[in-house]
């Protein structure tokens, strides 16, 4: 509170002028290590009521920097400009209160310029961030909401190993195949798939209903990129804008997935 209220520079000497503590006391305490993840966890535990529905969210944020010597300075994607620019990037893991539609930051890590080895990409860095800090998530959180960049086999399978399920977006050109549900022939290999799902063609999708002016359609399909069967939810808005989200087909209902994904997008 002192840092917010004091006038002038935020120095130990200035802090001591506005409190009963001495400059040396501030110096000693600021020299001690603080577990910020545990600090944030305790704060989130007090803020979000235990009865509220919660999910986790992971996303990266671009920070503009013009220096040359700053650690971690490199080219990262800037969503405001829709292109890669020089700067810094941080990966943020948050807990989302669905009832209040509010996200609370739990953990933040700076994205390194290069991966630890040649076989890894930045997706591995994001996954490593989640694996190392997911222990601080509330025990009733089992879903992680992400955008389309995280919809990759490496990330999805890594989450499943940790016991979490991903709710993410898919590209408009995602390679999806309908599952064959008809009668199999007595001889030969059984037919597994029944044609490709064309984004925009809702003739073979099941209509779920409408939520906040968005029509929901769903289907159980095979995703070639993720190499697994998933539930997709096709969102069609009044302005004809569309989006596709997904989850493991055994764990989520279409309406629930749209609400959870919409909580992050709004």
Enumerate the predicted regions with their spans.
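Gly/serine-rich nucleotide phosphate-binding loop at the start of the catalytic core
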Residues: 1-35
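Short, mixed-charge, low-aromatic patches
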Residues: 1-2, 81-87, 253, 257-258
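Single, function-defining residue in the core of a domain
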Residues: 6-8, 19, 51, 65, ...
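A common structural microfeature
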Residues: 9-12, 23, 52-57, 90, ...
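Exposed alpha-helical structural elements
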Residues: 11-14, 25, 38-43, 175, ...
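Active-site-proximal, Lys/Arg-enriched surface segment
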Residues: 31-101, 211-222
């Amino acid at each position: 509170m002192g840092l917010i209220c004091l006038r002038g520079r935020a120095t130990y000497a200035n802090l001591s002028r506005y409190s009963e503590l001495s400059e040396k006391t501030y110096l000693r305490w600021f020299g001690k290590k603080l577990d910020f993840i545990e600090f944030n966890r305790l704060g989130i535990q007090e803020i979000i009521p235990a009865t509220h529905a919660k999910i986790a969210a992971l996303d990266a944020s671009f920070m503009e920097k013009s220096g040359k010597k700053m650690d971690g300075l490199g080219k990262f994607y800037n969503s405001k400009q829709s292109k890669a620019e020089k700067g810094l990037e941080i990966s943020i893991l948050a807990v989302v209160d669905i009832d209040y539609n509010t996200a609370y930051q739990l953990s933040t890590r700076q994205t390194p310029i290069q991966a630890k080895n040649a076989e890894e990409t930045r997706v591995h860095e994001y996954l490593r961030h989640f694996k190392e800090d997911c222990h601080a998530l509330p025990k009733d959180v089992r879903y992680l909401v992400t955008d389309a960049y995280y919809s990759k086999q490496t990330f999805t399978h890594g989450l499943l190993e940790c016991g979490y399920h991903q709710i993410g977006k898919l590209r408009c050109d995602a390679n999806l195949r309908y599952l064959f549900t008809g009668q199999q022939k007595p001889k030969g290999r059984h037919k597994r798939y029944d044609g490709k799902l064309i984004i925009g063609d809702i003739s073979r999708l099941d209509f779920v209903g409408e939520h906040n002016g968005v029509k929901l359609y769903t289907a159980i399909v095979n995703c070639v990129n993720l190499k697994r069967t998933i539930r997709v939810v096709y969102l069609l808005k009044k302005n004809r804008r569309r989006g596709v989200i997904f989850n493991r087909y055994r764990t989520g209902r279409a309406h629930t997935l749209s609400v959870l994904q919409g909580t992050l997008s709004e």
